[in-house]
Design a protein with these regions (language model features):
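Conserved binding/catalytic microenvironments
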Residues: 1-248
Length: 248
């Protein structure tokens, strides 16, 4: 139909806007780092971290990406020191992918446990993190849970509920728009820190772990971002979608 064709044309244009940047060789530093991690199946083993990854990092195209990659590796190395791989996998077999239970067992934070879980291929977990502005600072997708590459994410994500209420766990079963046969369980958590002390600014970081879920029962209907979400009855929509509404 003409409506379907127009929607497809709009979607292609929307995606091409990002592809054009990549073709010019100026992909965002965050995307460079995520592409590097994707090539490693998102896994940095304790052996990798101990052996050093500088040779791989040096091959990234931009200095900004190399800086982000080094910061990511430093953080992963600190996580591994507190949550060593062998002991963490043994604990995981007992608790399941519960970041709060794992954090309690190792004296770590839930954010550290989430990052470790996301780096274990067998868990099949996605992970997103954001800063206090809500901007996504890390994006590891999960099957059937597409993440926005540009712009803001869905305001209904529990990630943002957690951002507004640090140190409180949020768990939900969700269904992504366009994924009627797939559901996920998400766990979100936020923390604050004061790197400049009492009189400095409070910084917030939130994370949302995305886990496969095969259970039945009610779900929260969410999307990726408004522009590419076809849910026509969403109360949180901030801008029109370029796709035809579901059921139309």
């Amino acid at each position: 139909s003409e409506r379907l064709a127009a929607g497809a044309e709009a979607l292609v244009g929307f995606l091409d806007a990002g592809q054009g940047i990549e073709e010019q060789g100026i992909a965002a530093p965050q995307e460079e780092v995520e592409d590097w991690l994707r090539g490693r199946s998102w896994a940095l083993s304790d052996a990798d971290l101990a052996g050093g990854l500088e040779e791989e990092i040096a091959r990234l195209a931009s200095s900004a990406a190399r800086s982000l990659a080094r910061a990511h590796v430093d953080r992963a190395r600190a996580d591994a020191a507190l949550l060593p791989e062998t002991a963490f996998l043994a604990a995981l077999s007992e608790t399941g992918p519960d970041p709060l239970a794992l954090a309690e067992r190792f004296g770590a934070t839930p954010l550290q446990a989430m990052r470790r879980l996301a780096g274990i291929p067998a868990v099949q977990a996605g992970l997103v993190t954001c800063d206090g502005s809500g901007t996504l600072t890390f994006r590891k997708p999960a099957t059937g849970f597409p993440l926005p590459r540009f712009g803001s994410a869905c305001p209904l994500w529990p990630l943002y509920a957690a951002l507004g209420r640090p140190m409180q766990a949020f768990e939900a079963r969700v269904q992504m728009a366009g994924q009627s046969d797939r559901r996920h369980r998400v766990v979100a958590w936020a923390e604050t820190r004061h790197p400049q002390g009492l009189r400095g600014p409070e910084l917030r970081e939130a994370a949302m772990l995305i886990l496969p879920d095969d259970g039945a029962g009610p779900v929260t209907r969410i999307g990726s971002s408004c522009r590419v979400c076809a849910r026509g009855d969403c109360p949180a929509r901030r801008e029109p979608s370029i796709l035809a509404a579901e059921g139309s």
